[in-house]
Design a protein with these regions (language model features):
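Conserved alpha/beta-domain cores
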Residues: 1-212
Length: 212
């Protein structure tokens, strides 16, 4: 999706890329995140304009990640179908970035169900995949019990979690010194997420700079 000019990749192009990654892992699980663009991960201008994505005053708080996908349901289902098709070639997990509302989670799961039905109708093979939620918005960390009822696993996205918890743009050099992974508020949120996941018997992983 990034570092390319013109149209975004179609379903078959995505499928080939995902399948290659799955096959290269020789049976080990592959976690594929749905489109996570916006803020520090922008698309090129032509692709953005194609999707009617206007320049935002504060992209970190705007139409990005799962919000962007849900605003473009046809594009989103296209990616979901490609990921599901790749699951026929090995162990695949699907990860949803930047969830903040249970309503977004429900919309996402509905989109996955629709994509599955489209593949069934087309006679294309796939297997059921585990679906996980990225916890990178404080709101998500604080409603973990509700999200854990809907998802199979969670992944702590520490870079954005720190940014949103401390109200700091990590790309802004004037406040970069305040970006603190060891801030008590950040650690309390992380502790809560891990505890709730353990209580629910769900796996939790960590990504971002804190993961090392």
């Amino acid at each position: 999706f990034m570092n390319r000019a013109g149209e975004l990749p179609g379903e078959d192009e995505q499928f080939e890329a995902y399948r290659a990654a799955v096959l290269a892992m020789n049976g080990l699980p592959v976690t594929i995140r749905t489109v996570d663009v916006g803020a520090d991960k922008p698309l090129d201008r032509m692709s953005v304009n194609e999707l009617r994505h206007e320049h935002a005053l504060n992209p970190a708080l705007g139409l990005r990640a799962i919000r962007w996908s849900l605003s473009e349901p046809a594009m989103f289902r296209q990616q979901l179908r490609a990921i599901l098709r790749a699951s026929a070639f090995g162990k695949v997990k699907l990860l949803v970035p930047m969830l903040a509302h249970v309503g977004e989670a429900m919309q996402t799961l509905d989109a996955i169900a629709r994509a599955k039905q489209q593949l069934v109708d087309a006679g294309k093979p796939f297997v059921d995949v585990e679906v996980g939620a990225m916890i990178e918005v404080p709101a998500a960390a604080l409603v973990m019990p509700s999200l854990l009822k809907l998802f199979d696993f969670v992944s702590l996205g520490t870079n954005d979690l720190i940014q949103y918890t401390l109200a700091i743009d990590r790309g802004d050099e004037s406040v970069a010194h305040l970006y603190d992974p060891w801030h008590p508020a950040v650690l309390k949120l992380i502790e809560g997420v891990i505890h709730q996941a353990r209580v629910a018997g769900k796996d939790v992983s960590v990504c971002g700079e804190m993961a090392g």
